[in-house]
Structure formats: C-alpha cells, structure tokens
Design a protein with these regions (language model features):
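Phosphate/NTP-binding elements of NTP-utilizing enzymes
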Residues: 2-202
Length: 202
C-alpha cells in the first residue's frame, strides 16, 4: 500500500478532499478546527457542538484517515443506541468503498465486512476488528481498541434521571479497560441536561 502524500498527513487537507468527494462545500473554519483538534488534541477529548456542525461525519473521516495512515489500528464506536453506532460505521465503510484514495483498505473476502464490525485489507489477523460499533449500555467486556469514539452517548432517554446518568457514567468508565496502552477516547455530543455527563468528564 502506497503511503499518503505528505500533504495529506495533515488531517485538515484530507477532510477537504473527502468533502469534495461527497460534493459538499469546503469545510468551514469550525469544521477545520474540529479536524485539527482530532489530530492534535489530548488523548482524552470532548468535542461539543450544535446539531448540524458535522461532528460525526468529520470524526468518521478521521477514522478512515487514521486507518489509511496505520491500518493496524483498532476503533470502537459507541453511541446511545446501537443503530446510531452502526450508522457511523456504515458511513465509514462507504468512504472506504467509494473513495479511490481509500481503496487499499477495502476488506478482502476472508475478512470481517459488516456494519457491526469490519477489517481493513492490510490489517493483520486479530480478535479485534478494525472498526466495531455498539450501544453504550451493551456488553463491552472483551473489546480492545486504540481509540474509542463515543458519539452522542448521552441522549434524553438515557440521562433524564440521576440513576440513569449514574448507569451511563458506569458504562463510560469501561472505556479505560478497553483501551490499549497509549489509547485515545474522543467524546462527541451536546449536553442534554444540567448535570451532563460531559461536564463530569471535563
């Protein structure tokens, strides 16, 4: 697999190319700022923004960019609902299948290839898929990842009461057990309540 051109080692440029592939306007300054933070921010980061800013699409693009740079990485995508996590991984798979620059990542016949979990072609055999999606209240034991993407883990129907918020917080604590040494956690979301989970993480 040929390495990416040096210019595309800056995720912001890769995002611009992806947006053009999707026939979207070039990324806004806010979107480019999110892209820079994804690449250079702390190992544990929270990205909060209004609906429609494109947090999930930008981060999905970030996942394929990192896999193109290093196909041995493992990602776990966690959302409030399994459907939302699956939507994230489905969009990620579509980018891999549709962008010529990402064609070296298309899974081979003997590899996992579903919206629940998939491998990228150059990945070595491993118990953990390249990308796996699941609901935040699901069973995470046994999962391993270099980076956890927590995409809208907090929504009104799982954070309305204090016991619900406590249960959610306990699930989020499991992320540490999943991470490989030096791993990263990225939270994407919008606070839903005054005692938001995101406020306790800051």
């Amino acid at each position: 697999m040929q390495p990416l051109p040096k210019k595309l080692h800056d995720f912001r440029y890769f995002l611009i190319i992806t947006w053009r592939h999707l026939n979207l306007p070039d990324p806004t300054p806010v979107q480019l700022e999110i892209a820079e933070y994804l690449q250079h921010g702390e190992r544990r980061k929270i990205i909060q923004g209004f609906r429609g800013v494109g947090k999930s699409w930008i981060t999905s693009t970030y996942v394929v960019w990192r896999l193109r740079m290093n196909p041995q990485l493992k990602f776990l995508v966690v959302s409030a609902s399994k459907d939302r996590a699956d939507n994230f991984s489905t969009f990620t798979m579509r980018l891999i299948n549709e962008m010529p620059l990402l064609s070296p990542l298309i899974p081979q016949d003997h590899q996992r290839n579903s919206k629940i979990s998939f491998d990228v072609a150059p990945a070595s055999a491993d118990h953990a898929p390249s990308v796996k999606s699941q609901g935040v209240l699901g069973q995470m034991a046994g999962s391993r990842a270099d980076e956890v993407i927590a995409d809208d883990c907090e929504v009104p129907n799982n954070s309305f009461t204090q016991p619900m918020r406590d249960k959610l917080a306990e699930s989020v604590k499991e992320f540490d057990a999943i991470l490989k040494p030096g791993g990263k956690i990225t939270f994407l979301g919008t606070p839903q309540v005054e005692n938001s989970l995101y406020l306790t993480l800051e």
